[in-house]
Amino acid sequence: MAAAEQKKSYKVVKQFKGLNTKANRTAIEEDEFSWIENVQPIGYGNARVTPSYITSKDTGGNAVVWASTVSHLTSCNIDITDYVIAFQTNGSAQYYNIVTKATGNVAVAGTFSNAGVITSQWKNERMLILDPAKGYFTWDGNNVVSVGSVGIIAVTNTGSGYTGAPTVVIGAPIDSHGTQANATASVLSGAVALVSLDDAGSGYGVPPPSITISGGGGSGATAIAGVVTFATGTASAVVVSGGTGYTNSANTVVTFSGGGGSNAAGTAVLGGGQVKQVIMTNPGSGYTNAANLVVTVSGGGGTGAVLKGIVNSDVNCGIASFSGRVFIAAGRTIFYSAADSYTDFTSVSAGSFVLTDSTLHGNIQQILAANNFLYIFGDDSINVFSDVRVDTNGITLFTNTNVSASVGSKRANAIFPYFRSVLFLNDYGIYALVGSTTSKISDSLDGMFPNIDFSYPIYAGQVLLNNILCAAFNFRYFDSVFTNSYRYVQAVFFEKKWFITSQGDALQYVTSVPVSGLVTLFGTSGNSLYQLYGNASASITSRVQTALLPMSDPIRTKQALKIGIEATASNISSITMQATVDSENQQSPPYTLSSLVSWINNSLQVVVWKNNSNATIGWGQIGYNLYKTDASMYGKYVGITVTSSNPGYVYNGFEFEHELRVRF
């Protein structure tokens, strides 16, 4: 009988759980991996190499290359067509039509800011675009329109003699692709008391539209309108004291000075001898300092009116369509449109809400509509709006609930719905928000987070891999083990398991798009557009590093004798792997494992086969193979690191033959 220390022992690993970087390689579970890249650990004996990326082609079969440097990648749906949209650093935007493969311009250079643009969707009619500084726009598949919508309409002269409601005509929008605004007048005691918006329109700007009131049996009624744009750096004024004796609106002058900007202008609306409000005829631009913005009133026959200047300096940071409205976040304020409108932010059912919660530190970072909630993300908090309704007076009501007072995210493009949860990444983990419960799901990635470069954008989205809906987070990562360099990788999550993919070392932006009903991930590397995981036959570098196994006895030294790797190839005839045998202190030279069959002649010489092009060909077999080799390694713990560039195969198991040696 062999001595105990010379008895051969065996270990087989087939239950694949996924990546675990939280603990040392010697301390993770035996069926976990200390690194698993471009291999999806689907289940027992089934770890499948993921497809590589494929270049997106236009109608002429040419690679899709954006005209300028990409600053944001997103997608939208117009009618039944899905688009990938690239916003660029020169302020332009371009589209790629997923159905027809056509490319084209969404907007010319200078339309948008060079960074910070975010988007949402209104029905399947148009993409909603929020620029951090230039305001709110829409794109309907043909034209970008600035949602300068008609704002407050103030009656400057009530007129007299009206026996019925007069007709109100609002001037045409400045943008020829805008939509016409409409309003209705209300009469009280023979005078026009109120002009109410029916449709706020779009494409309005400076100067604001004219308001014409006619008919109704009376005369003399006049009104003026302002415009809502959500542009920052603009100025407005509120009345602190209305003063007395103001009777002549024609020569009442409102003057803006200071504040760092220019061109702000407004018209005073009088009533009862007082200044009642100021309608901005030009909000100006470049205003930054409300403290030294001075607004004065002169003329009009009165005295004592005091106005306060307001500067809109809050950066636009979130947009979402929810409950039949558009919600826009800026600073700590949420603006919401009227019911069933994407442009009307003035009517009675529209409004704004300032988050005064102490749990919101700083400003809102992002908003997201999903699962019948509107999620309001702060850097370290999450609120939800729900139960949106309109009361009998037409006022919009909703419930505001804080669901997380300690965890949030400022990574606006790494927040997205996944099944019935919302997943989000922050600087110390990845979390799932299910209902009102936030839980960390990235414990297995704790060893990676110190090496993530948070100075670069982080994007995320859903993707279907091997008929499994996965969540993928794309970030720039310093790989200190395999490449000793920064590269972009994707941390992919499904069924409580993580693995890593690499779909291009310079893949900076990604976005999810449904293609023929399948959730697909597109990305940009440089200025080129790619469909990720779209090429199952292209070479792709896969890396699998098992746990360092104690072989049931961590005290005794193990002498590795052989290793084996079970793999199945369904569409390629051969697989070549480079494998090392590892211990807690060292790593063997690489062993080449291959399924190629060598032909030997009667003289025991290898027969080399050539094709018609005089290229050497190999003989292999499709299906299951056991790739095995003698091994030389010793240590308290033993594991395998295997790399390959072959696509389309499945790891079925990892096998070890070893002998137990001395204790301690």
What does each model-identified segment do?
Residues N142-T156, L188-A191, S583-V597:
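Internal, charge-rich low-complexity segments
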Residues N90, A133-K134, W139-N142, A330, ...:
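Acidic/polar residues in short coil/turn loops that connect beta-strands
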Residues Y96, G171-P173, S214, F335-S347, ...:
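Predominantly extracellular/luminal cell-surface or secreted proteins
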Residues A2-V106, G110-L128, S406-K410, P417-S421, ...:
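Beta-sheet repeat architectures centered on beta-propellers
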